[in-house]
Amino acid sequence: MPIINFNNKEILFNYPISIIEIIKKFDKNLSENCIAAKINGKLLDVSEIINYDGSLELVKPENKIGIRIIRCSCSHLLGYAIKQLWPTSKMATNNITENGFYYDIDLNHKLSKNDLKLIEKKMHQLLKINFKINKINVTWGKAYEMFKNLNEIYKIKILEDNISKNSSLYIYHQEQYVDLCTLPHVPNIKFCMFFKIQKISGAYWKGNKKNKMLQRIYVTSWDSNSKLKNFIKNIKELEHRDHRKIGKKLDLFHIYENSPGMVFWHHNGWIIFRILEKFIRKKLKKFYYQEVKTPCIIDHDLWRLSGHLDNYKNYMFHTNSENKQYCIKPMNCPAHVLIFKKKIRSYKELPFRISEFGSCHRNEPSGSLHGLMRIRNFTQDDAHIFCMHDQILSEVSSCIKMIYEVYSCFGFKKILVKLSTRPENRIGSDEIWDFAEKQLELSLKKNKILFKIDLNEGAFYGPKIEFTLLDSLNRKWQCGTIQLDLCLANKLQAYYINNKNEKTNPVIIHRAILGSMERFIGIITEEFSGKYPLWISPIQVGVINVSVDQIDYVKKITKFFLQKKIRIISDLRNEKISFKIREYTLRFIPYIIICGKKEMESNSISVRNKYGKQLKYSSLEKFYNVIYEEIKQKKT
């Protein structure tokens, strides 16, 4: 006879009862918009039978967990539609994403855009049936038999690889369609009305390129039509801002299809890259770093000693020469340790700060590669600080200050901060991890930084602080990291001589600001829609003439600004002035100088800024002073 508490009210039930019936007893109206519930904090389907006392908490569609449940249920609706259209298809794995979900399927037929429309149409047809979703609790053996009869080979592999044979599990039925899930599902398919199929891509089974390539269908899914429409509106804006399109339009870079994840920088893009590099170098000088350069290919043994081969092997590229094995470095830290230990160092030399724009390679799955945002070869603005235990707080604080200084120059004001704690797969004792996590927590509190704890998401060698930027569309970009490492120096036998003349392992602080230079360029390209601030823009000023009479004057202006180290181009073609202005405007050139007869005779200039506003300057020097200040102040 369960006693259930809800909203400070208790009801005694004389028999085991389903959650949905319990909700109806409290308030019938509430049951219409409830998709799941918690009893004593445990998340359950509303069909669950309760025979024990507990506190009831409702899960509604708009709740954070509610939208996940809707997306899980909608992913099964997608599976149902696909099986209706292509009965021999095999369903593999589905995952919830930030805006919806994806499902990997094995289908002999290569899906087209028209097929995606057909799937979406079928999903809406199934919605009209308004069917209930049923759950059954089965043994591992029963589930295995069920999926074997359905010839669902991937579900069988999931059972064999991920689920204990002694456990029971839940199977969800959407009419004839059967699937596995660990989350509760909505009680009725009507809660899954608001979705849109977005795209399709390739994905290897289990992310392993040795396995079969599957087709991954991405779907956005929401709890209301207004949220769906708003998301689609944002998607159109994102398409307009897509750094890959802008990169092509502004001639910034390209990625050769036969060399996936590797960037070919063009002149304009490389200008931006070098500007960022120069900008970070100034910060490094301000915060007393030494810049170094280490090789890309390093002996296999170093990575074995550092622990990377045990913990990071699948993401590393390997090669060999003259019967020796090498790794192409995925990160710079072991190489920086070699520089530190090249000579005997005293405690008086600490903190020892070294930085590198290191070319790193990571074997990312081909299906996850995306323009500059996810690549295999990237440049890390990486640094390592070798210090003593009593220097940790001041050094981490200095890193935090540096990171915030950099982000402010790009107009990023919303920064989310997380403290990621020890993962299951790690090196070092619990005592070491306790100390390291506490030091990072104290550093954040000392600097009055609001942060969240991200359990079990630290690096294998130490906890880390992650800095995530929120852009103008409220997208999240994880960029900066500060990682505290009390293990690597010991593993690689790096030490300094302390004030008692004893060998002591230094603490290593791993620090990156932009993270990947390439990725950060992708981020700011989308943030500014290609209309970069003047100080970053690959072309800062464009000069055009109205007629051939002003050619010499344009050349004079161009020479003047080149001598002032302003990035300027000119267009002397015998074209209409409106055509030239439009062409430069489409190239997002911040300032366009227009030279006509009046300007030439008065030795002045007319300027059109990126907002289309017309400006007049009586001399080149006056205009230069304006843009010099804009560049100096790094206005965004």
Curated annotation (Swiss-Prot):
SUPFAM superfamilies reported in the protein's UniProt record: Class II aaRS ABD-related, Class II aaRS and biotin synthetases, TGS-like, ThrRS/AlaRS common domain
Gene Ontology terms, MF aspect: ATP binding; metal ion binding; threonine-tRNA ligase activity; tRNA binding
Task: Give the main EC class.
Answer: ligase
Gene3D superfamilies of this UniProt entry? 3.10.20.30, 3.30.54.20, Anticodon-binding domain, Bira Bifunctional Protein, Domain 2, Threonyl-trna Synthetase, Chain A, domain 2
Show the SMART domains listed in the entry.
Answer: tRNA_SAD (SM00863)
Q: How is the cofactor bound?
A: Binds 1 zinc ion per subunit.
Q: List, alphabetically, the InterPro entries matched.
A: aa-tRNA-synt_IIb, aa-tRNA-synth_II, aa-tRNA-synth_II/BPL/LPL, Anticodon-bd, Anticodon-bd_dom_sf, Beta-grasp_dom_sf, TGS, TGS-like
A single GO BP:
threonyl-tRNA aminoacylation
Chain residues that bind Zn(2+): C333, H384, H510
Q: Region labeled Catalytic — which residues? A: 242-533
Give the family per the record: Belongs to the class-II aminoacyl-tRNA synthetase family.
Q: What is this protein called?
A: Threonine--tRNA ligase
Species name:
Wigglesworthia glossinidia brevipalpis
What does UniProt list as this organism's lineage?
A: Bacteria, Pseudomonadati, Pseudomonadota, Gammaproteobacteria, Enterobacterales
Gene name, per UniProt, is thrS
